[in-house]
């Protein structure tokens, strides 16, 4: 029946999904049970395996210390003995003779289960449960048992009442209450109902399984109307309780039924109690979901068991002595059953959140129950407390042996009552009775007494591990048993059995989740467990008590205490009881805490682990108590959270026991140990840091028994949530200093507090991470299994987090060496945890993320230490950083915050945004940083907005400290208004002068750079950025200068968030700040402070401390903000653009300041700042300055200029919001740089005089081109795929100088607009980058290299992307960047002389064929002008290889190949930042959004006609399908041409910008993207005056931002670009096919031939988004001006 195939199992086909598998190495092989010829014990072996593997049962049974012993016929004693063997024995095959004998004696009168005679496994299973009930609750009847410690009734029994309600007359029959241990269903009815359901519904779903079972169970069970109205009504069954283990017995018509396959296929792995019965009255039952964990099968008169072993997340097959691993999925079991013709008899569904039974009934029982539930073993859902007290039960069995004379009758009575609805009611009844009478006390009691103390722990652990596996066999054994076994199996796999494992699963989820995620569960358990942790041994005890009520726990406490103590002491002492009281106290506390906190906090994974650990706890309680006095407290802390886990760490033997192969048993007794053994290090990595670090790191896990370990895990989770450092101190203090009782008391209090804190923090972390450690339901058994495996992982992760947190604190305190040591330790722990996380993809990702962050932090610390060694600049950043946030030291931005941010400590991020931003940026791992940013995003946006200047200033201050001059700080203070922003920028200019030199110095030695010439400074800044990327310390020195410039910008912008937002008032300022590129991708979306911070970071060119800080904060802010609110992102982007524009003006500000009056207008206050030589400023100032500010404090002027340009960029369509896009600032910068270049020309004449308006600055036709391009692009709304990374950048938006916001195309919606702003920001950034390159970033070339570029400004972004990459970016464009760097270095002076666009410098690489190909690919759908500048516009596309070698860096930058998603913030600093990417993104290439999501550029779509406008010189781009159009001045859209013709161009520009932004190291390339004016035809860029006029002329409301590549990356001299003949080796000047990228490899031809011929595309390229009329006007002007 195909319909049956896994239809009802759905995604939860196997429990493993629910439980995180523990490393198989940590699990000892599952033990088989012998079945010698003639014994015919397979039915018993199957039932026994199921019981053992059911975590709930195993753990609950361990908790039971007292029972009514029946001597030789005591089934309880026999079970205790076998469980002890499971847990402790090293034998692979164990005899079940004792239990078989006790069972036979118990049911001797009934002649059932007699020796040598085969019997029914389901009946055996049910009777064993009833006998257990008799032994532990002899005074109660089977059907009326209310004992809290009765595993059978509390975990397995279904309290039902039947009633008939007539639908016609409404008559109702008297309710018939009854209890059943097994819910029997006819397989025939099951198949029939399944067919009917499938006929009624198109698709079967896993949720239908419960309904299917309900229908099948009542099928044909029709009753007459109670009022005899003649109606035949179906009986209704109402479930009154919430069993954690549901046993479904399948009744077969034949031993060789042909329905076997159909039945197996119809089985579901998830069962909802609400679906199974007509109605459920218990709220828990309504919500509980049980998972198939075990199945007893029958075939050929032989029983075998399948059980899901949560430890290894695999289904195990138990065939007596043979144990085989089936697979992780339920389908694997189905396959085997079909092949083996197995008939499922018992299905065991366990609640992953199930907990051990409460032993409150017993003197220790009350405590026991709470504790049991708290320490749910995930698999031991049924009567879990008893199971949990398994080992303890063994010891308690000795301690409290009592025989219940009426056990037999009770069992019998209960069996019949419970089976009221069961088909085998009578038989079951007798079986139950007999088994109770004879079985439990016989073997179990004897064994229990002798082995309970010693073997109880071991056995428990082993038992817990094996219960699952062996449970598998029992399942296979009998129909009834099978059903139950499946449940148990499922639950253990899940973390607990379905019925009683619901709570345990929750606990397990919480526990595992906590372990995995800062151990919140541990925290909840830690309240109890933390105290235990403090005591080392006490924790396990406490944990078992949590599981065990006081009564049961009494004995278990003794055994647990001794066990936990021995565990703590590395000795397994199952019988140690000295600390019983402490253990009890701890247990009580753990019980409460875990119930309250653990469940919530624990994720499915945690829960399972917790469950397993809990069983161990009872086993370890003695050792806990022993350790209770000493290490036990520490472990106690840990213990509550993760007793089992801790035990694993503590004792290899315990680990082995846990390794018994049964996760449930391991959790109970050996599973926790196994988990710890395999994952102890990984778990400890995170857990120890909090518990171990504070409390003596090692002891916490080493000395905590398994149970204690579970508590510890919980505690650690809580502590971790509360704070790594926080949990640490507690554990450390309690471990050694206090007596057991004192420590216990303190631990209880601490655990309560820690659990709460950890819960809250875990919730926060979870919220930030989007991970729910305790999901309401598990997707499948596999998930539950994963949960189980995460125990050790959780611990390791928490320890690592704790250590890392300490490292951050030390770093903040300035102790970099100690911080580095701790960071390395955290890295090692994270690596261990990574192994533990192998079970879960999420866990793996989490650990990997944190590992990357830690690695980056370590690198940043190393860099910082290096910086401190060369304290010239670092000292300044340090000074500034303290000003910003005491937490961050010079490189603080890199050091402390990353992890905090990752921890999603939004509050911290907010308070220490700058610091955290930097750290985040530096440590920015694609996921972690973004997560951090996500958490930061809202906060940082608001806080930054609130105090952007302060945050940004702080960041800038720290950055600038080294390079900052008074003027720089003044600039910081200056920003009081948009105008002031520019002034500040100019102020920054002054600092830039010094910082620029510093940048150079920084580049060289971090301290002397600021004294290098501005150009040098830029180049050095780039290089330093590059170096800083390599060496966080270097970035820090560079950063200061930039910080200064940016600070001014940020301050002005930040002083009034409105300034950032209100960059409209600062038209020039609102342009993207080139400095931003690093952080821009993140910060762009952030408020000004963040943006500024990013700018500062970019400006400081990876000023590691600031860079990391800013980037992190901004990135965090950005990531969440961008995805969540594009509008916010856009506004942030705009703010950032303004800031970046300011910073750019600061960086390029000197140039602009000296070059453009327009820029100067806004930055007039800073005009006083000494402008760099006009030539230099022009040549490389825009980008050089940007780089400078990015790289050094002296770049601020450049940034100011950038700011001015930013306004232009915004005017040209880059909204500030765009700037917020990581790479958008870059787009803004290119425009800014263009303007700067033009202004620089003007400034040459005007110096700081009045810089023409941005509109006038650019050549008219360039502007027109840009306008059209923007227009068309906006129309198309198809930004380049490359731009996609920064959605804001993706859209090409031209904003009018007077307008802050991008002029959105009428058809754009807000999202499109936002995306466009992002794209435009990217585009403008690219333009600015081009300008920067054009400006003459000869020295920046190094930085501009994909690597060097990444190393510098882009390095910042990339660093954010990969904080661990202190060196050059590792992108494929690295080579290009290197070439670019060299070219830029060479071309800096060239670019400087270049009037508007120094294209010679950047043209080689930029326009190389390969580079153009890349650009074309990334910019597919965008027009690549054939002109050399056009390639600049779209750095991705290659211009003629020889003539217009686009700077490789630029291309790369634009190409989306760079991992921009992670480091969306692309440096807009200069062409050098552009990572050359040979590949061209196809128009359809999905651009990674700033949120890290691949998205098509907003405007890009296959429907959009894409064409590359290749320069006449023969630049052609290959790899992208572009409309074959060659853009030359003739081909460029004229006034008569439709705007659409420009859409591709603008799109190209946008894409280029986007790509640049997208590509962390490709920012400069963006500049090329924007440069349309470049033409091989010798289109001469209008004189500076022309450009200035163009920009300045008020007649052009849409301010076109000519992208002047100030940096050497775009250093192709303007004369080369405009006047120079085709570069040698370049393709023919004639039009190129747009659809075919050049064949030449940009690397070869571009670099080889045109390193000297790079043309600054930004020179003449204006990216303008304006109304059609204005665009037409602009075009007309451009045409007139350039006379195309």
Curated annotation (Swiss-Prot):
Cysteines joined through disulfide linkages: none
Catalytic activity entry: Thiol-dependent hydrolysis of ester, thioester, amide, peptide and isopeptide bonds formed by the C-terminal Gly of ubiquitin (a 76-residue protein attached to proteins as an intracellular targeting signal)
Result, substituting residue 161 to K: Reduced ability to mediate cleavage of tri- and tetra-ubiquitin chains
Stretches the record annotates as Disordered: 374-416, 430-578, 607-703, 720-742, 859-894, 928-950, 967-1060, 1139-1227, 1334-1391, 1425-1455, 1620-1652
Domain USP residues, every copy: 31-352
Reported tissue expression: Weakly expressed in a few tissues.
Enzyme class, first EC level, given as a word: hydrolase
Residues noted as binding Zn(2+) 3 in the record, renumbered to the chain: 166, 169, 225, 229
Effect upon mutating residue 505 to V: In a breast cancer sample; somatic mutation
Its EC number(s): 3.4.19.12
Modification type Omega-N-methylarginine: residues: 12
Compositional bias segments (type: Basic and acidic residues): 437-448, 481-491, 535-544, 608-619, 1192-1204, 1375-1385, 1632-1643
Superkingdom classification of source: Eukaryota
Gene Ontology biological process terms from the UniProt entry: protein deubiquitination; proteolysis
UniProt-annotated binding residues for Zn(2+) 1: 67, 69, 74, 77
Residue list for modification Phosphoserine: 481, 603, 632, 671, 674, 1189
Biological role: Deubiquitinase that specifically mediates 'Lys-63'-linked deubiquitination of substrates with a polyubiquitin chain composed of at least 3 ubiquitins. Specifically recognizes ubiquitin chain in position S2 and catalyzes cleavage of polyubiquitin within 'Lys-63'-linked chains. Not able to deubiquitinate substrates with shorter ubiquitin chains. Mediates deubiquitination of PLK4, maintaining PLK4 stability by reducing its ubiquitination-mediated degradation.
Protein name, per record: Ubiquitin carboxyl-terminal hydrolase 54
